[in-house]
């Protein structure tokens, strides 16, 4: 059990026998009336995001979540195979466990997988990854000062928008949460 004072992003709550992960929360103390906590909760099974308000100080049941560092090995077509870095035990994860971030998975990437009662709930990639550009159109000399972007295909097959000065073969840092270009990595 936890109170609203214990809320933090990533905490998994058990509400109506469903596991809900806190994505965002805000403590509100209005000038009139009692304080409350406004939250955005994500159902860990369906991925549906809902808004819920809790009165301040209310006790809420939390789920015991075991987070483990695992290495992504390969995709066998229907699932992603990962290996526990401590026990070398392999597990097959359904595609929804990674969500949209799966498009940035590269072999031997360390991911953090969260389990509840032995069942995988969700997996998180590092916030940023260094990935090589497989293909992008060349930027024209006059285009470089405009600050525009162009599409580029990464070594994982994902497509992102990069600045015009990026060329095929460059290594770039990509934010895995939203797929945005962060910077060019010097080789």
From Swiss-Prot:
Keywords of this entry: Cytoplasm, Elongation factor, Protein biosynthesis
Family annotation (InterPro entries): Elong-fact-P_C, NA-bd_OB-fold, Rib_uL2_dom2, Transl_elong_fac_P/YeiP, Transl_elong_KOW-like, Transl_elong_P/YeiP_cen, Transl_elong_P/YeiP_CS, Transl_elongation_fac_P
Any single GO BP term: peptide biosynthetic process
GO cellular component, one term: cytoplasm
Pathway per the UniProt entry: Protein biosynthesis; polypeptide chain elongation
MF GO annotations: translation elongation factor activity
Taxonomic superkingdom: Bacteria
Subcellular localization(s) per the UniProt record: Cytoplasm
SUPFAM superfamilies associated with the record: Nucleic acid-binding proteins, Translation proteins SH3-like domain
Chief location: cytoplasm
Membrane-crossing segments per the record: none
Known role: Involved in peptide bond synthesis. Stimulates efficient translation and peptide-bond synthesis on native or reconstituted 70S ribosomes in vitro. Probably functions indirectly by altering the affinity of the ribosome for aminoacyl-tRNA, thus increasing their reactivity as acceptors for peptidyl transferase.
Record-linked NCBIfam families: efp (TIGR00038), PRK00529.1 (NF001810)
Family: Belongs to the elongation factor P family.
Name of the protein described by the UniProt record: Elongation factor P
Native organism: Corynebacterium diphtheriae (strain ATCC 700971 / NCTC 13129 / Biotype gravis)
Gene behind the chain: efp
């Amino acid at each position: 059990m936890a109170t609203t004072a214990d809320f933090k992003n990533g905490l998994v709550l058990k509400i109506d026998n469903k596991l809900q992960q806190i994505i965002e929360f805000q403590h509100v103390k209005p000038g009139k009336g009692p304080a409350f906590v406004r939250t955005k909760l994500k159902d860990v099974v369906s991925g549906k995001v809902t808004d819920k308000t809790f009165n301040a100080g209310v006790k809420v049941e939390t789920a015991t979540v075991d987070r483990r560092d695992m290495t992504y090995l390969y995709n066998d077509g229907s699932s992603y195979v990962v290996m526990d870095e401590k026990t070398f035990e392999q597990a097959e994860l359904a595609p929804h466990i990674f969500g949209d971030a799966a498009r940035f998975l590269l072999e031997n990437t360390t991911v953090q997988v969260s389990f509840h009662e032995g069942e995988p709930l969700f997996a998180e990639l590092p916030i940023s990854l260094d990935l090589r550009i497989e293909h992008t159109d060349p930027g024209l000399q006059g285009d470089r000062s405009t600050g525009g972007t162009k599409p580029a295909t990464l070594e994982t097959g994902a497509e992102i928008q990069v600045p015009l000065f990026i060329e095929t073969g460059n290594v770039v840092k990509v934010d895995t949460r939203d797929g945005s270009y962060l910077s060019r990595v010097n080789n």
